């Protein structure tokens, strides 16, 4: 039992250190970055549902699940985070504080649009308040 607790503590320590490193790398884990990661996960999951359940994916030839399309989606999500990381480093180099926020807002809007598109492919009506919120975010991103 003591070995289990030691291993558990070791794993938690390693995970905490990795989390702290990633947070530091991204200039802190703020609400915007948290929102982006959540939206990325929702978009990926709803994309899987559109392909796997509804067979309406535009990412595959037959509209169904395809491992290559899923892998491309994961690669794009990783590249999005790399671009955010580039924005953070540019902020540090230039001594500004708005580049990361502008980039994150742009990607949040992109993910939100994709989530809404996935919902539409599932046959769900999209409330106007969601459409208006996306428009507001898009305008904020354009201003920055």
Located regions from the model:
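Alpha-helical phosphate/pyrophosphate-handling elements in metalloenzyme active cores
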Residues: 8-28
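Membrane-water interface of transmembrane alpha-helices
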Residues: 42-57
């Amino acid at each position: 039992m003591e070995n289990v607790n030691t291993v558990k503590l070791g794993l938690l320590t390693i995970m905490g250190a990795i989390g702290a490193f990633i947070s530091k790398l991204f200039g802190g884990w703020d609400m915007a970055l948290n929102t982006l990661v959540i939206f990325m996960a929702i978009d990926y999951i709803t994309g899987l549902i559109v392909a796997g359940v509804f067979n309406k994916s535009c990412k595959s030839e037959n509209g169904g699940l395809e491992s290559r399309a899923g892998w491309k989606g994961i690669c794009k999500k990783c590249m999005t985070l790399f671009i955010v990381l580039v924005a953070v480093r540019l902020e540090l180099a230039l001594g500004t504080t708005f580049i990361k926020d502008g980039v994150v807002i742009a990607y949040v809007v992109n993910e939100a649009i994709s989530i809404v598109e996935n919902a539409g492919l599932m046959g769900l009506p999209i409330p106007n308040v969601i459409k208006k919120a996306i428009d507001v975010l898009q305008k904020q991103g354009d201003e920055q």
